[in-house]
């Protein structure tokens, strides 16, 4: 059987995505399974993570799998100069699947080419975060009842935000309309605009976070400005609090509007939004368990 990886959402067809959404719903209805009994899952986090790592580990535990790995690269042989190739080769001897986050773009793709063990990308630099995309799409499906013809407004860091880049690819099959709100320093890279042009996806660029745009939206996708992507602290300080969503901005929004955020947040959503029924970011994070159960079982052919 040909090895299967989950490296980029661009590797997924429309049918692949719909199948994974269906499987996510199955795992939400049937949370505790024995599907990973006798399976060892390696979680290799070369970059800090809380939500993604714990979500994957919860997904594995719910499926009765066992976990090996690390969350602090400084405690591993990588800190002694071991190459990524050698780390992957060694861990492949121990595990049935490798879930990895790395600070280098393309690291997961590279890993997938040097091992026969399935690779699941838990984020590679500013490139892709496909498991987040699947849980985002599942959250949209759950809250909207459809994936088709949604108006999606994305706010904040569109340049470095790998969740944003993956989401554009994943939703491209479903005729979305996008509104992009970002300061000049964090605008969406041209390669993604070219992708949308090539796929006849309608999108609008904005610099101002206007209530009128919120009121048109089915999904409001907030993102944080990522301090770790900036070499210049002054540049970060200039843009970190440019856009802040407060509860009063939602007064005339559509009834079906839901607010998503890949988390963590650092001030771009005020705490008074948390009790608004349109806030969905905490439920969204929980959906990650089911989406990641679906991904792991899919690459293992279970």
Curated annotation (Swiss-Prot):
Which key words tag this protein in UniProt?
Pyrimidine biosynthesis, Transferase
| Cellular component per GO, a single term | cytosol
Q: Which reaction does it catalyse?
A: carbamoyl phosphate + L-aspartate = N-carbamoyl-L-aspartate + phosphate + H(+)
Q: Which InterPro entries match?
A: Asp/Orn_carbamoyltranf_P-bd, Asp/Orn_carbamoylTrfase, Asp/Orn_carbamoylTrfase_sf, Asp_carbamoyltransf, Asp_carbamoyltransf_Asp/Orn-bd
This enzyme's EC code(s): 2.1.3.2
Query: Which residues bind carbamoyl phosphate per the record?
Result: 51-52, 101, 129, 132, 263-264
**Superkingdom of this entry's organism?**
Bacteria
Q: In which pathway does it act?
A: Pyrimidine metabolism; UMP biosynthesis via de novo pathway; (S)-dihydroorotate from bicarbonate: step 2/3
Question: Gene3D superfamilies this protein is in?
Answer: Aspartate/ornithine carbamoyltransferase
* Pfam families, alphabetized: OTCace, OTCace_N
Q: Which residues bind L-aspartate?
A: 80, 162, 224
Q: What class of enzyme is it?
A: transferase
The record's Gene Ontology biological-process terms are:
'de novo' pyrimidine nucleobase biosynthetic process; 'de novo' UMP biosynthetic process; amino acid metabolic process
Q: Which GO terms describe its molecular function?
A: amino acid binding; aspartate carbamoyltransferase activity
Q: How does it assemble?
A: Heterododecamer (2C3:3R2) of six catalytic PyrB chains organized as two trimers (C3), and six regulatory PyrI chains organized as three dimers (R2).
HAMAP family linked to this entry: Asp_carb_tr
Instruction: Spell out the family assignment given in the record's similarity comment.
Output: Belongs to the aspartate/ornithine carbamoyltransferase superfamily. ATCase family.
Tell me the function of this protein.
Catalyzes the condensation of carbamoyl phosphate and aspartate to form carbamoyl aspartate and inorganic phosphate, the committed step in the de novo pyrimidine nucleotide biosynthesis pathway.
This chain's protein is named Aspartate carbamoyltransferase catalytic subunit
Query: What high-level taxonomic lineage is stated for the organism?
Result: Bacteria, Pseudomonadati, Bacteroidota, Bacteroidia, Bacteroidales
């Amino acid at each position: 059987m040909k090895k299967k990886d989950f490296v980029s959402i661009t590797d997924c067809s429309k049918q692949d995505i719909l199948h994974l959404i269906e499987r996510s719903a199955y795992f939400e209805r049937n949370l505790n399974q024995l599907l990973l009994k006798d399976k060892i899952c390696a979680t290799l986090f070369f970059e800090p993570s809380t939500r993604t790592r714990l979500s994957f580990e919860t997904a594995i535990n719910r499926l009765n799998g066992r976990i090996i790995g690390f969350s602090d690269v400084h405690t591993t042989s990588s800190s002694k100069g071991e190459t990524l190739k050698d780390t992957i080769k060694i861990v492949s001897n121990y595990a049935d699947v490798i879930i990895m986050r790395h600070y280098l773009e393309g690291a997961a793709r590279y890993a997938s080419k040097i091992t026969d063990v399935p690779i699941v990308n838990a984020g590679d630099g500013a490139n892709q975060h496909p498991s987040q995309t699947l849980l985002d799409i599942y959250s949209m499906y759950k809250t909207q009842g459809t994936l088709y013809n949604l108006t999606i407004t994305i706010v904040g860091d569109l340049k470095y935000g790998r969740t944003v880049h993956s989401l554009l690819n994943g939703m491209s099959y479903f005729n979305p309309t996008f509104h992009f709100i970002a300061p000049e320093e964090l605008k969406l890279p041209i390669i993604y605009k070219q992708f949308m042009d090539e796929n006849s996806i309608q999108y609008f660029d904005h610099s101002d976070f206007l209530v009128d745009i919120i009121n048109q939206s089915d999904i409001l996708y907030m993102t944080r400005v990522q301090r770790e992507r900036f070499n210049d602290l002054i540049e970060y300080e200039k843009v970190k609090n440019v856009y802040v969503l407060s509860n009063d901005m939602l007064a005339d929004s559509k009834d079906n509007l839901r607010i998503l955020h890949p988390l963590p947040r650092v001030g771009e959503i005020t705490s008074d939004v948390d009790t608004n029924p349109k806030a969905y970011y905490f439920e969204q994070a929980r959906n990650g368990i089911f989406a990641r159960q679906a991904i792991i079982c899919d690459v293992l052919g279970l």
